[in-house]
Amino acid sequence: TATNTSVVVNKFGPNDLGYIPATPAELGGWTGGNATMVNNAINSGSFLLQHRDHGYEQGWGEPGYSSSNIDGLTNTDLTYVFSINCLTGKYNMAGECFAEKFHRYTYNGNNSGALGILAASEVSYSFVNDTFVWGMYDNMWPEFLPTYNSTPVERGILPAFANSAGKYFLQASSWPYN
């Protein structure tokens, strides 16, 4: 467990917002997914894909999903990807990083993969990433953190604006330091 696990469970768990269980065991037989499940979700038309765990230049650690798995996509409804972890957007590396592959991918000559992707270009820090994501979600769904009182204008409730909102939330928040 991370140092701030109790803070997160107290806020988002059954004693406050109720978004998560008190312990992972309460999730039942959930295994965390795999590359096939990720591709099936995207190919079925998922609007938004969120990954918040370990990442590297060519993909995600848990569940394992890499640039080569993107070749299994056949979607024509493009998804938006929040890849909030280390290095998946490392555009300055030799060759194509994970975010570039996701964004440029085509299937049978048609755009496939992602319409847009938000990904870190360098190493990022876990609890800071969590706090950033909470700010993004509260911008897109203002009731996510009811006590934060965000009031974005309707045109601002989009993934691109959520990126900025997450940064403002992180700057104003004491979360990473609790």
Protein language model regions, located:
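Cysteine-dependent hydrolase recognition
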Residues: 1-178
